[in-house]
């Protein structure tokens, strides 16, 4: 390195790296400095001036650097922007620097300067950031400095970096070196390597060994390139140390750093992982080589379309056939006509720019004029333009603009589309720069290219007035004769100062070339393009002119005393420069009555803010204007809660004013900011001589308020609405809300932020807004329409009822006066009961109506607690004076009937759906100004937050922001441990990256998990158990059936959207311990469903009606938590057969009836019926009410039995021992071979648990023996494990002997006889069709056919009937019964009552011992386990689940009589 010019010798000992301790300051603000390039410097380290070093680093740190090895410090620089607010808003670049040597420096550096070598490539990220801030400054030149902001920084160590290189880079490089290494020779021919045929020499093929060697060389080259970098930045282009082209000397394609973790820039360590990615080159210039390193900082971004190769250089007329049309960007005569300027306007000459004279269309012969097109000439505006009627084009057929109609000195102006500003534009970017005390609310901003079309200069006074939307149709505004006279000035205009800014987005026409050469048949087929430029207006000014969509801007003209105007641009410049609005002698202000401005506690803060507002700037106001004052409500209530006097009161006012004025900064979202509104009543100007002489007001009634001379009077209050937030961003302008920003947002050179965030508006909010707009409209008030009383009800708290109502009022500018019924009840109950409660309620309502009954909505929260009889009368009186009353409740049943009768509209707010949850999350993120990284998908987060309401979703967002802060702090602590220097969170933010700047997906996942864990009990959010298919051993056929039943409605909901029924009820039955509950949990986990587990006793309640209400609440919670699984364990205790219980009140029967009613709606095709799956588990399905088993309820019955093979038992053992440390000699197959086939899943679980317990006991015994055998005597077990225990003493391994020993002690939970009983129950409920029926011998399918068969003595079951569990459905093979009619005698059947019945004489008479038979559904009772010849089944099911066999066993023979 050559530092001799600045006094640093090459023999000077290198200084070691700085070790910063606690002396670093965490809250240091950036310092303004200048960055310059020096061609005489070498290396990649810059030089820092001495004054900057003293300002950035502490003295002790500088002393440590002087004795270090290399003396390298690290700073972060960013382009200077006037809109700086925080470190996160800038794109910082970390660079290595050294301090300027002072001993032998012949040339002194400039003050606050950073010098960098011209050949340094570490400035690439800074150049990119500089190009985004100012597109004209995307490169640096030597000895020309740029303004920057600089901070000291401690670099973060990188964990992983991804380096992208071109695919087959070394292979192509070797081929080039082989072909051109010796240059062009005669032996190769005159065409080089290409002969006369034009074919190149074939490249040699690479073997696998050559490819491996090439990969090693490439890895070494990348490592060498990275080793030369002190700081690695994402996006850096690294030149690879490979030979250049032998002939062109072009360097090989470089490597690019595509991604870094955990931050976007930092230090390389020995532990940093380097991931090499080989990608194909993209784009037209993908094969272009990297420019030389010396010219890297001088390059300018080139357009890819500017390629002048032979293949692409052709004119528009020579376009190749078959290609798509090329769009060209030209300026046409239509843009000239849009200026609407007259012949006397001095801005016409500026429109004749060179752009309008260039045409890129192919030369063609002119078409003969005919039809409509014959009327269009060169003077007619282009069709599709903004003003295409030709009125202002002299010579056109539609123009009446002639020399006789021209008015000198007055131009037509130009129409602009209005864009509202969200924050103030700094004065530093304006030219000419306005004074600091000028009113920023009277500034408008346009693109600098449109100033000439208006006819003014930047900083001039212009007049603005509302205009209509320009018509796209050229004949839309066509009029004839005298009807086309231009209207006179309406007088509703106001003067503003206009400033031109560069870099604003401008719309220009783009026309496609007509390649076909055919003539367009009509003008209407031309695509309409809107070319209206934009004007950026402050939101308060926009609200004072009634929020127009378009504005007409024209230059100000000043009349002389004799009434004639003075044309001429020079005179216009003199008048504009000399004229200013008149000063106001006296201004009257009216306080707009709002709940905030009427609060007595906030009055001192309100007037202190008003004083600060008018003293800080010379405000320009007009009679009727609205003025907004920001007030910090929290600080105002805290500071002015008591009475202050003297100096302390003035200090409190200063605190309130300054914090209120700073509300539009980044901390606006952390404080509650309110706005108080004042209306300008009367403005009296100081001088009226000019107005008397000219007879007109040349300034539109505006005047300047000078705080030194103007007398201000606050006279009374005004009742009116405030500006609505729809289409107006005054909340961001006044600091009520924070402007949302993304991770990759970069500051703009003009500082304009005009894109309002798109908030998601729920349909209920729109409905309430429409109702309030209609109720408060002047027409409704004039006609005396009844007021609107809206009730918002929900079953859960914090669902957002009051928030929706408040936002609906804010949308249309209506005041919201909240009243908490609990406060009313508390104050009234403490002072006299219902009478006082009524008086407090009326007093609060009367206070709200002071703000205007026609523009105030009364919001009563928790109205269900106002149950007194006197409240009904009070509410009726309140409604007589109000226009809008909104009440919220979570228990609508407790609201008195008198109040319910007054309600006109009632809306229910349920738990938000997935799309609604996504909208709530989006609004919460936007309002808090939280940056989201690219990997965050709010839709997936909404999917994981089922059953959470609006309050919980907002808490999730806040928890995610807190998780980001904790993550950054932990990253700083980890970097501190690695480097040994002090690292702050600010250093992580300076390093940048998505993870540092924004909230990541991992932060949201942690927030969702924490929210579910902390709020599950309070809000009833169901928990998803962590059980998967791997935890369920065996049951493969059951898993397949579940996937078919549940997965199809979840993945293809559109199939069921139009009424198609789906099977959402599943019943698991079988012996106890076979995994029914475990399988239900696995369903919820595998399909990402929420999980409810309902036990029978939870539904019972001693009060009448409450048990059924509990059933309704369970299913309502399940619908709110969709997609959800409701699991009824031991269903036979919840829904037994009706009529068999002995309870006097019939509670169980009512529970069953309510359960049946709820299950009917679960599988419907309605909009809100899907997404809930009901699963029941029982050991005794024969005890269930038969109505539960019909299709549409529990229509899918799955039997879960014991394993019938040892291989299935081994599969279950493998699932149970997944987390066990098994001995290598253990074979689970051998263990399973020794087990009986009567073991259930629970028995196998007990076997594994006992085996593990025996292994632990054996290990504990061995440790005790080892302790007792110690030479120095026994020690405590804890001391042994802390000091003497080895790895073998801690690890517990289960051996095969442990399993065998556990098996010897294990008693099966289900005996073989009980398993036979469950198998018979299974045969009762299941039937398998093993053979297809012959259509000719099919069983009777109608009731009439069955009755005829029975009456004729025939068989209702054919010979080739389907088999039931192996038994043929023949008189000799089935022991069944047909309810009330038994065809085969001698088969005892036990009835529901437990009595045995027999058939007599083969005629189907069913005789009971009690003299009565049980028929109908009750005859499907439980079967006796002791009867060997029991009836097997009453229901038959084919192999195809969709083919149903008609059951006729419930029919009776009408010819028989029951005895």
Swiss-Prot record:
SUPFAM superfamilies: P-loop containing nucleoside triphosphate hydrolases. Signal peptide: none annotated. Gene3D superfamilies: 1.10.8.60, P-loop containing nucleotide triphosphate hydrolases (3.40.50.300). This is Peroxisomal ATPase PEX6. CDD domains: RecA-like_PEX6_r2. GO terms for biological process: protein import into peroxisome matrix. The keyword Membrane applies. GO terms for cellular component: cytosol; peroxisomal membrane. Residues 1444-1459 have a biased composition (Basic and acidic residues). It is a peripheral membrane protein. Its main location: cytoplasm.
């Amino acid at each position: 390195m050559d530092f001799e010019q600045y006094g640093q010798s090459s023999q000077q000992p290198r200084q070691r790296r700085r070790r910063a301790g606690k002396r670093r300051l965490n809250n240091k603000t950036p310092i303004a400095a200048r960055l310059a390039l020096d061609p005489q410097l070498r290396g990649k380290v810059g030089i820092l001036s001495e004054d900057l070093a003293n300002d950035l680093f502490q003295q002790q740190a500088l002393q440590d650097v002087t004795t270090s090895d290399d003396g390298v410090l690290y700073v972060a620089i960013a382009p200077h922007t006037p809109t700086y607010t925080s470190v996160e808003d800038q794109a910082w670049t970390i660079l290595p620097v050294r301090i300027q040597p002072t001993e032998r420096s012949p040339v002194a550096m400039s003050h606050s300067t950073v010098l960098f070598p011209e050949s340094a490539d570490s400035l690439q990220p800074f150049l990119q950031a500089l190009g985004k801030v100012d597109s004209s400054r995307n490169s640096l030149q030597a000895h020309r400095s740029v303004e920057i902001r600089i901070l000291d920084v401690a670099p973060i160590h990188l964990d992983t970096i991804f380096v992208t290189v071109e695919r087959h880079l070394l292979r192509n490089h070797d081929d080039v070196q082989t072909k051109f290494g010796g240059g062009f020779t005669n032996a190769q021919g005159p065409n080089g390597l290409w002969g006369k045929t034009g074919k190149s020499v074939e490249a040699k093929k690479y073997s696998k060994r050559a490819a491996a060697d090439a990969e090693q060389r490439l890895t070494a080259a990348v490592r060498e390139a990275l080793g030369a970098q002190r700081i690695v930045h994402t996006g850096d282009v690294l030149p690879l140390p490979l030979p250049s082209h032998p002939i062109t000397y072009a360097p090989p394609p470089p490597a690019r750093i595509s991604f870094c973790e955990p931050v976007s820039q930092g230090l390389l360590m020995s532990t940093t992982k380097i991931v090499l990615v080989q990608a194909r080159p993209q784009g037209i210039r993908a094969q272009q080589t990297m420019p030389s390193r010396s010219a890297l900082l001088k390059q300018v971004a080139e357009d890819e379309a500017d390629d002048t190769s032979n293949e692409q250089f052709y004119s528009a007329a020579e376009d190749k056939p078959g290609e798509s049309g090329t769009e060209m960007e030209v300026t046409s005569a239509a843009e000239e006509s849009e200026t609407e300027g007259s012949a006397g306007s001095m801005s016409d000459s500026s429109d004749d720019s060179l752009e309008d004279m260039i045409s890129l269309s192919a030369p063609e012969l002119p078409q003969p004029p005919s039809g409509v097109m014959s009327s269009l000439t060169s003077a007619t505006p282009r069709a599709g333009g903004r003003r295409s009627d030709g009125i202002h084009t002299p010579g056109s057929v539609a123009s009446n603009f002639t020399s006789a109609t021209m008015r000198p000195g007055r131009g037509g102006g130009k129409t602009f589309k209005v864009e509202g500003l969200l924050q103030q534009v700094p004065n530093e970017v304006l030219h000419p720069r306005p004074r600091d005390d000028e009113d920023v609310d009277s500034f408008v901003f346009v693109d600098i290219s449109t100033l000439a079309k208006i006819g003014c200069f930047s900083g001039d006074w212009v007049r603005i007035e509302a205009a209509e939307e320009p018509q796209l149709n050229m004949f839309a505004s066509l009029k004839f004769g005298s009807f086309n006279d231009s209207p006179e000035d309406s007088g509703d205009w106001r003067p503003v100062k206009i400033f031109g800014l560069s870099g604003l987005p401008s719309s220009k026409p783009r026309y496609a070339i007509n390649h076909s050469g055919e003539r367009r048949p009509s003008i209407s087929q031309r695509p309409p393009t809107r070319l209206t430029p934009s004007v950026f207006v402050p939101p308060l000014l926009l609200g004072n002119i009634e929020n127009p969509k378009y504005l007409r801007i024209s230059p100000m003209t000043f009349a002389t005393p004799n009434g004639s105007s003075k044309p001429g641009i020079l005179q216009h410049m003199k008048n504009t420069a000399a004229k200013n609005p008149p000063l106001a002698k006296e201004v009257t202000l009216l306080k707009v009555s709002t709940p905030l401005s009427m609060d007595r506690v906030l009055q001192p803060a309100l007037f202190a803010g008003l004083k600060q507002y008018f003293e800080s700037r010379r405000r320009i106001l007009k009679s009727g204007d609205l003025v907004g004052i920001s007030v910090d409500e929290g600080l105002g209530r805290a500071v002015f809660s008591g009475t202050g006097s003297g100096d302390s009161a003035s200090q409190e006012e200063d605190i309130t004013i300054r914090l209120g004025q700073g509300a539009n900064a980044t901390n606006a979202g952390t404080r509650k900011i309110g706005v108080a509104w004042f209306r300008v009543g009367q403005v009296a100007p100081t001088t009226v001589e000019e107005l008397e002489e000219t007879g007109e007001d040349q300034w539109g009634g505006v005047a300047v308020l000078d705080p030194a001379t103007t007398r201000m009077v606050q006279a009374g209050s005004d009742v009116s609405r405030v500006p609505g937030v729809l289409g107006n961003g005054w909340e961001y302008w006044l600091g009520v809300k924070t402007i949302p920003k993304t991770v990759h947002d970069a500051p703009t050179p003009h500082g304009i932020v005009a894109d309002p965030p798109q908030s998601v508006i729920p349909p209920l909010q729109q409905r309430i807004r429409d109702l309030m707009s209609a109720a408060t409209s002047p027409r409704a008030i004039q006609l005396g329409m009844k007021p609107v009383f809206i009730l918002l009800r929900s079953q859960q708290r914090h669902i957002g009822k009051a928030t929706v109502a408040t936002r609906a009022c804010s949308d249309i500018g209506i005041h919201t006066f909240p009243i908490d019924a609990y406060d009313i009840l508390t104050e009234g109950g403490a002072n006299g009961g219902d009478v006082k409660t009524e008086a407090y309620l009326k007093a609060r309502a009367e206070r709200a109506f002071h703000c205007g009954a026609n523009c105030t909505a009364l919001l009563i929260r928790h109205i269900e607690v106002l149950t007194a009889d006197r409240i009904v009368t009070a509410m009726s009186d309140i409604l007589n004076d109000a226009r809008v009353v909104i009440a919220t409740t979570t228990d609508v049943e407790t609201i008195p009937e008198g109040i319910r009768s007054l309600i006109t509209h009632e809306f229910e707010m349920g738990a938000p759906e997935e799309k609604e949850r996504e909208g709530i999350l989006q609004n919460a993120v936007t309002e808090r100004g939280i940056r989201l990284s690219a990997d965050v998908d709010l839709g997936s987060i909404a999917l994981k937050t089922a059953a959470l309401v609006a309050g919980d979703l907002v808490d999730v967002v806040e928890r995610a922001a807190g998780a980001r802060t904790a993550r950054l702090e932990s990253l700083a602590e980890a970097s501190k441990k690695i480097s040994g220097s002090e690292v702050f969170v600010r250093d992580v933010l300076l390093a940048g990256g998505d993870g540092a700047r924004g909230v990541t997906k991992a932060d949201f996942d942690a927030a969702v998990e924490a929210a579910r864990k902390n709020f599950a009990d309070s809000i009833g959010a169901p928990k998803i158990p962590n059980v998967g298919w791997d935890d369920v051993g065996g049951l493969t056929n059951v898993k397949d059936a579940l996937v078919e039943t549940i997965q199809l409605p979840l993945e293809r909901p559109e199939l069921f959207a139009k009424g198609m029924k789906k099977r959402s009820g599943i019943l698991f039955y079988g012996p106890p311990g076979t995994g029914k509950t475990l399988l239900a949990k696995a369903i919820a986990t595998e399909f990402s469903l929420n999980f409810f587990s309902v036990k029978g006793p939870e539904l019972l309640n001693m009060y009448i009606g409450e048990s059924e209400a509990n059933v309704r609440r369970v299913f309502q919670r399940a619908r709110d938590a969709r997609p959800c699984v409701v699991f009824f364990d031991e269903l036979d205790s919840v829904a037994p057969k009706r009529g068999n219980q002995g309870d006097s009140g019939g509670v169980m029967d009512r529970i069953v009836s309510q359960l049946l009613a709820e299950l009917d709606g679960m599988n419907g095709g309605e909009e809100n019926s899907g997404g809930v799956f009901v699963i029941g588990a029982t050991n005794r399905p024969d005890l269930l009410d038969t109505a539960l088993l019909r299709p549409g309820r529990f229509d899918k019955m799955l039997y879960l039995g014991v394993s019938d093979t040892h291989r299935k038992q081994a599969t279950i053992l493998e699932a149970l021992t997944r987390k066990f440390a098994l001995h290598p000699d253990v074979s689970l197959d051998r263990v399973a071979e020794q087990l009986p086939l009567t073991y259930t899943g629970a028995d196998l679980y007990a076997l594994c648990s006992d085996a593990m317990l025996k292994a632990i006991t054996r290990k504990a015994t061995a440790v005790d023996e080892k302790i007792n055998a110690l030479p120095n005597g026994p020690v405590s077990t804890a001391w042994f494990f802390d000091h003497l225990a080895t790895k073998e003493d801690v690890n517990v391994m289960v051996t095969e002997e442990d399993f065998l020993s556990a098996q010897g002690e294990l008693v099966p939970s289900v005996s073989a006889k009980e398993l036979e009983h469950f198998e018979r129950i299974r045969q009762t409920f299941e039937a398998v069709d093993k053979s297809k029926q012959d259509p000719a011998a099919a069983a009777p399918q109608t009731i009439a056919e069955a009755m005829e068969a029975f009456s004729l003595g025939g068989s209702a079951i054919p010979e080739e009937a389907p088999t039931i569990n192996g038994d043929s459905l023949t008189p000799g093979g089935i022991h069944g019964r047909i309810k009330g009619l038994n065809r085969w005698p001698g088969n005892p059947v036990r009835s529901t009552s437990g009595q045995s019945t027999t058939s007599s004489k083969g005629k189907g008479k069913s005789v009971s011992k009690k003299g009565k038979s049980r028929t109908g559904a009750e005859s499907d009772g439980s079967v006796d386990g002791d009867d060997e010849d029991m009836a097997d089944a009453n229901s038959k099911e084919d192999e195809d689940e969709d083919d149903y066999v008609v059951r006729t066993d419930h029919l009776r023979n009408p010819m028989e009589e029951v005895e």
